[in-house]
Regions:
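Glycine-rich oxoanion-binding loops at beta->alpha junctions
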Residues: 2-3, 49-104, 109, 139-148, ...
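N-terminal phosphate-binding or glycine-rich loops at protein starts, especially the Walker A/P-loop
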Residues: 2-50
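Short glycine/serine/threonine-rich phosphate/pyrophosphate-binding segments
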Residues: 18-28, 49-50, 83-88, 104-116, ...
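A glycine- and small-aliphatic-rich helix-loop capping segment at beta-alpha/alpha-beta transitions
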Residues: 26-35, 55-61, 116-125, 141-145, ...
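Short, acidic/small-residue loops that bind anionic groups at enzyme active sites
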Residues: 36, 40-42, 117-149, 194-198, ...
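Accessory alpha-helical/coil subdomains and C-terminal extensions
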Residues: 101-107, 112-115, 143-246, 250
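C-terminal non-catalytic interaction/assembly regions of soluble proteins
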Residues: 231, 239-286
Length: 286
C-alpha cells in the first residue's frame, strides 16, 4: 500500500478491444470524479500516451456509452513501451500531466513493467479480453458478449448446413486459449470442439466420426475450431476429400469483438471499474 495521495488519474485501454470496455471507462470516470479526482483520458493506448494524446474527461464524455461496443478511447499495441527508453518517456509524460494514479483495461499481454515505470503508487487494471485467458480471475470483460455473438452465428450456420447436408467448420477467436470454442461448442451442441490446449487432435478420428454420422442419417456436422488450431479452410478441404461430404469453413473473425455488450458484461465492467478507483485511492494494485 502506498501513502501517496492520488489527485489525478490516467485512463486508457490497451491491446485488443472487448465489449464492455466503455462501461468500465464510464464507471471509472464517474466514480473518480465523484470522489474529487481529476481524470485524464489517453487515446490509442500506450502509443497515445507516448504521443501525448491526453484529454481531460468529464461525466458528459462518458454519457450514453454503457451500451456501446469497442472503446471510446480507442486502443493500440505499442512495442516502444517494451523498451527502457519508451518507459522513461512515458514516466516523464505522466509527470508532465500530473498523473499520479492509473487505471487501464488490458488483455492477456499487459506491459510487464507497467507498475514499475509508470507510477510509484497504485495502478489497478481491469481484465478486458474476449478470450477469458487472464490468470487470477474467473471473468474477463467482453467474454459473455463475444460468446453470445459467436453462438448466434453458429446457430445460423447450422441451419444452412442442415439444408445442404454439409459439414461446417466454424472458426472462433482464441489463439492460445480455447474458452470461446469450448463454450460455443457446448452451447451449440457441436459434434467436435478443437482447442489450442489440445492441439494434437486426431483428424482421422473426425473423418471416421463424420462417416459414421452420415450412415445414421445425420444431416449436418459442426466443428468448432479455435483460431490457434490452424487453417480452417485447408482443414475443410481435407475433410471433404476424405469423407465426400461437402464441407465449408466459416471464420467469424473480428465480429466477435464488436457489438453492444450484454447485461453481464455491462454490470461486471461497471463493478470492476468502480472498485478499481477505490483500490487506487487506497494505494492498492491488482
Amino acid at each position: 500500500m502506498s501513502d501517496k495521495i492520488i489527485r489525478t488519474i490516467g485512463v486508457l485501454t490497451s491491446g485488443g478491444d472487448a465489449p464492455g470496455m466503455n462501461a468500465a471507462i464510464r464507471a471509472v470516470v464517474r466514480t473518480a470524479l465523484g470522489k474529487g479526482l481529476k481524470v485524464r483520458g489517453i487515446r490509442r493506448g500506450y502509443q497515445g500516451l507516448l504521443n501525448e494524446e491526453i484529454i481531460d474527461m468529464s461525466a458528459r464524455d462518458v454519457s450514453d456509452t454503457i451500451q456501446r461496443g469497442g472503446t471510446i478511447l480507442q486502443t493500440a499495441r505499442c512495442q516502444e513501451m517494451r523498451t527502457e527508453e519508451g518507459q522513461q518517456k512515458a514516466a516523464a509524460i505522466c509527470k508532465k500531466y500530473g498523473i499520479d494514479g492509473w487505471w487501464s483495461s488490458e488483455e492477456t499481454d499487459p506491459l510487464p513493467a507497467r507498475r514499475s515505470w509508470l507510477i510509484s503508487g497504485s495502478t489497478p487494471s481491469d481484465p478486458g479480453t474476449i478470450d477469458l485467458d487472464i490468470g487470477c480471475t474467473e471473468y474477463t470483460i467482453g467474454f459473455d458478449t463475444a460468446v453470445n455473438t459467436a453462438m448466434e452465428a453458429i446457430d445460423k450456420v447450422r441451419d444452412t448446413s442442415t439444408s445442404h447436408e454439409r459439414c461446417s467448420i466454424i472458426e472462433v477467436m482464441g489463439r492460445d486459449a480455447g474458452y470461446l470454442a469450448l463454450w460455443c461448442g457446448i452451447a451449440n451442441g457441436a459434434e467436435r470442439i478443437l482447442m489450442p490446449e489440445e492441439h494434437d487432435y486426431d483428424e482421422a478420428a473426425i473423418v471416421a466420426d463424420i462417416q459414421e454420422c452420415r450412415k445414421r442419417g445425420k444431416k449436418n456436422y459442426i466443428i468448432i475450431n479455435a483460431e490457434g488450431i490452424g487453417d480452417s479452410m485447408n482443414m475443410a478441404k481435407r475433410i471433404e476429400e476424405a469423407t465426400g461430404m461437402e464441407t465449408r469453413a466459416t471464420v467469424l473473425g473480428h465480429m466477435q469483438r464488436g457489438g453492444s455488450p450484454t447485461c453481464k458484461d455491462r454490470v461486471y465492467a461497471s463493478i470492476m471499474g468502480a472498485m478499481a478507483v477505490d483500490l487506487l485511492i487506497e494505494g492498492k494494485t491488482n
